Amino acid sequence: MGLFDFSVKELHDKLVKKEISPFDLVSESFNRIESVEDKVGSFITLNKEAAFGVAEELGDAGIDPNNMLAGLPIGIKDNIVTKNLRTTAASKILENFDPIYDATVVSKLKNAQTINIGKLNMDEFAMGSSTETSYFHKTHNPWDLSRVPGGSSGGSASAVAAGEVLFSLGSDTGGSIRQPAAFCGVVGMKPTYGRVSRFGLIAFASSLDQIGPITKNVEDNAYLLEAISGLDANDSTSINQPVERFSDSLTGDIKGLRIGVPKEYLAEGVDPGVKQAVLDALKTLEKLGATWDEVSLPHSEYGVASYYILASSEASSNLSRFDGVRYGYRSPNATTLEELYTKTRSEGFGDEVKRRIMLGTYALSSGYYDAYYKKAQQARTLIKQDFINVFENYDVIIGPSSPTTAFKIDGMINDPITMYSNDILTVPINLAGVPAISVPCGFSDGLPVGLQIIGNYFEESLLYKVAHAFEQETTFHKEKPNL
């Protein structure tokens, strides 16, 4: 049994009692990375020297019994800036970017005394659902190396599933934590928009992006969200909501829970194996005293279209800062200022990023703004209202995290429309801004299936309670890929 088979709480107790040291945990991480990283490719940059340095310091000082995450190894998605540690957003344009400050979540993790093992691979600028658009390399799913780990936080999910780190941070703009968590058989939480500071997150779509934790089990996830949540003066969209002790909500008692299951989430297009795993999960929850009814989120059908217009529009604005003048890649082939802009961006951005910038710029252009951007915003309002309506009568909404299990590498990369439409079950949650968690709920043809539990605004504690109660009745989270 490896050290990462233990939970956060178990490892914390061992550290406090000095049965193990932070150095042991960091060694476990790098030994595992040495043995499997060539196969999975979870990381872009490793932080080996600094990680061992922090581990030695913490070992010498002793672990604070009140600091649950102290001495534990974490991986951080490479769109979250880390001071003096290369941060690339998996793009050529930021290949050698060395930030001069830490993101708020990174500062919070340092205060919690976690140890950063390195920066995790992702789709370039978080644009993708497969971690195939990274400038550096593709990440492979630990359960089947011929398949994708999901995206855009594919490295964050694969590193946890492969046992390279104990837990990780990802970001979720349209499903980028939940879908890879589902594909890799781990737990991923997208918090309520504004629950976690975005300061230091390299922006894709500012009204949709949210940072969240990826872990092996629900309890670990709750501890990590406690550490990174809270109001931040540096992020005007962060919300002044008390940081709850999410870990206190894991009582296992969900008697009387009212579940809404949207008919749109189990409709045509959802793999039969995925649908069956979700129905079996609902039976498990019924045994625990919950009830469920079929409900409708009637405007879900507009989710993907409105999401791709809005997210691409925001991206075209956000990514205009990468111009070759201030930081990042600068084309050596430019002779005029105009050439500097066009060549830097043409050479520095990958195809998918360029596709979305063009789509967004088109949607925002004067002749098309009303027809596309404005209409997408109206659809977003209707989607948000759908959730509000269901939550008047139900505590949580449940469905699959993805309509399929992990697909083959190179299987969809040249078919963007199919890839985009695969986000149908996750993007409405970002458009509405509500929280959702993906937990392992079974297997289909040997590949993990994720159960998506969606809550009302700031109801993360309830999501953890439901997810934990389900997890206690099953063993899916204990299954490990055979690498």
Curated annotation (Swiss-Prot):
Gene Ontology cellular-component terms listed: glutamyl-tRNA(Gln) amidotransferase complex
Disulfide bonds: none
Active site: 77, 152, 176
Record EC number: 6.3.5.7
Enzyme class, broadest EC rank: ligase
Annotated family: Belongs to the amidase family. GatA subfamily.
Annotated protein name in UniProt: Glutamyl-tRNA(Gln) amidotransferase subunit A
Species assigned in the record: Listeria monocytogenes serovar 1/2a (strain ATCC BAA-679 / EGD-e)
